[in-house]
Amino acid sequence: DLHLEMLRKLHYSVELGGFGSRHTPAEALACPALQDVRLSPALTGGAAESRRMKILLDGMISDCHKMGLRCLAEGIETKGQHELVLSLGADYAQGNYYAEPMTAAEFEDWSQSCPQICCLE
């Protein structure tokens, strides 16, 4: 935790990746240096098809916000998934729905034409 706190003081963002997968324990959310939580594509993809997964994702986003953490929904592939994570309050989203993987040069061109790169609005 001391090293993570040092990184925060140097203005680095401390994120927990893959949250909601079996490899990321819930107690990792208790780390005081943590700022952002990246929600697993297994959660975001499953929530569009399963009522229980949607309830689980909703609760995770809500609980993260209660702890002062921002949520990034990973693996967004469809408009339905985009609308779902937006309605549940995710702060950010990423996935092929927004853009396919690209080179740095392609990213420069793409970023000039896309006004909402960073936030769900």
Q: Which residues does each PLM region occupy?
A:
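Heptad-repeat coiled-coil signal-transmission/dimerization helices
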Residues: 1-4, 57
